[in-house]
Amino acid sequence: MYSKVFYNTLFYFVLASILYMLFLQTNEVLSISYKEALNYFENISLLTILTRISTTLFGQNDLALRLPFVVFYCLSVIFMYKIIDDYFKTAKDRFISIFIFMLLPGLLSAALLVNSAIVVTFLTIFYIYYYKVYKKHLYYALPFFLLVDNSFTILFLALFFYSFKDKDKKLLYISLALFVISFFVYEFRVDGRPQGFLLDTFGIYAAIFSPILFLYFLYAIYRTAVIKNIDLIWYISATALLLSIVASFRQKIYIEDFAPFVVIFVPTMMKIFLHSYRVRLKEFRKNYNIFVYIVLFFLFLNILLTFVNKPIYLLLDRANKHFVYEYHFAKEIAEELKKREMTNVVSPDKHLLLRLRFYKIEEYPDYFISQEAFYNYDEKITIKYYNKDIVNIYVKKL
């Protein structure tokens, strides 16, 4: 039996390894997408503030652009590790739980992209950590959450439900007021005809957790309610899950609004699984072992696809079918244009121009570029991954 110190050391080693891979991915592989460029240059939001501060401090590059979100991932994992300090009887089980949490497909993706999901995840985990340590709610942070993102409406509703269990009138009034305010400020729609997006929602949840893990998540939510061992985390995750299911009957939901509140249930889910596993003799653990192998297979497959996905282009007949196509090639195009001293360009593709602007390629009529071939172009620039053409840029000097 290894000591707690050993597993703590192993935890920080694994976290450091994941952070290294995330930094490598952000710096060497990903390019800014059109939506990310919109947030950086044109929108005014928390994402704009975070990315602008980071690029001001560390330079206008991909690593600086995504650095805040990798940091929020790191903090989310560390605070979750602290929250589950007394969840398990052994340090080994605690490590297994946080290991699964760290490798969640949805969490890793949120750490790599310019989006609010990982920020919401961290703030929610920090709120839970504060509540656990100090045995009181962080009331003063809740109005700030209202300004951060519309998805905190779900947290306010969960806290409203939890206030009845906790018999906390102050929490009841504050959470109800903030829920009503956020509902109207962010103009949530509940109209329209039923269209049935439930299967789509379940499919996205399966991608966030991995398919088998999501099925066990549903069971764990139900099981926790049956044995009446519900806590604040259960209220938050169950509220988000049920709300997303109900909303899916009428409209297509933005899963990033719900995902931060369901992934935090993973340690509780693992606690249920490991308890069921430990109480059985070895000869009766076969089905559980199969479950573990399947879950680990999908998690490591996800890691492979997250960090080594460019070879998938070799399997596709059209490059734009790649699931992260919109996060590729802009940086490479900018580098090729700079090599040719073509730093001022115009194009009918305004999305591409906004992406290139991040790499200091300005919109000015010195050169005309297009992804579509046209008569009498001067030069053709081809971006290749693993010797396969990904995108062609046709250039004409004006």
Located regions from the model:
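Hydrophobic/aromatic-rich transmembrane helices and adjacent perimembrane loops
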Residues: 252-285
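Transmembrane-helix motifs of polytopic, lipid-linked glycan transferases
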Residues: 67-87
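Specific aromatic-rich, kink-prone transmembrane helix
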Residues: 119-137
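Transmembrane-helix signature of polytopic, membrane-embedded enzymes
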Residues: 80-103, 121
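Signature aromatic-anchored transmembrane alpha helix within multi-pass, membrane-resident enzymes
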Residues: 277-309
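Short periplasmic/luminal acceptor-recognition loop of GT-C membrane glycosyltransferases, typified by
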Residues: 305-390
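Short acidic/glycine- and proline-prone juxtamembrane loop motifs at membrane-interface regions
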Residues: 109-117
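Extracytoplasmic catalytic/substrate-binding loops of multi-pass membrane glycan-assembly enzymes
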Residues: 15-50, 60-63
